[in-house]
Amino acid sequence: MCIRDRVKAISKEYGDETVVQYYGATSSDDRAKAIKSFQDPKSKVKYFIGNPQTTGYGITLTEAGTVVYFSNGYDLEKRLQSEDRAHRIGQKKSVTYVDFIAPKTVDEKIVKALRNKIDIASQVMGEELKEWI
C-alpha cells in the first residue's frame, strides 16, 4: 500500500477534514496551511501525513502525540531530525514513535541499519543518543 492509498484510507475512516499532507509535491502555501491546521488545537486536523525527507527540517509539530513511520530511509540524521519536529520546545506531552515494518522486506533491513548506526554513534559519542527503533 503506497502513502497515497494510506492517506485515502485514513481520510475515509476519519474524514477528509482530519488529514493534511506534506510531501515533496506539496506547494509551499499548502505546506504552511497543513502545519498551521495541525498545530491549531481547535482544528479538526488530527493526522499529519508526511515523510522524513520533507518534514525533517524547520517545522514544528508539537501537537503530535504519536508519530508513525510507514517507511524509512538509510539516513539516520533525517530520521532523527524528523523525530525532533514533534519532540521539541513547546511539547507538553510524551511522544510515541511507531515503525510499521513488514517482515522480510527492505524496511526491515533499513530499520536494522538505523539501529546499528545509533549503536555506533552512541559508542563514539560515549552516551545513549536515542532509544527509539
Outline where the language-model segments fall.
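SF2 helicase motor core recognition
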Residues: R6-S11, A32, K46-S71, D75-S94
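A conserved SF2-helicase RecA2
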Residues: Y74-I133
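Residues at the C-termini of beta-strands that transition into short coil/loop
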Residues: Y23-A25, S71, I101
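Conserved helicase ATPase core of P-loop NTP-dependent helicases/translocases
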Residues: D16-T55
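Short, small-residue-biased leader/transition segments that mark boundaries at the very start
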Residues: M1-I3
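Class I S-adenosyl-L-methionine
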Residues: K8-S11, G15, R115
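Residue-level detector of conserved, well-ordered beta-strand and adjacent loop positions
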Residues: Y23, G50, T62, V98, ...
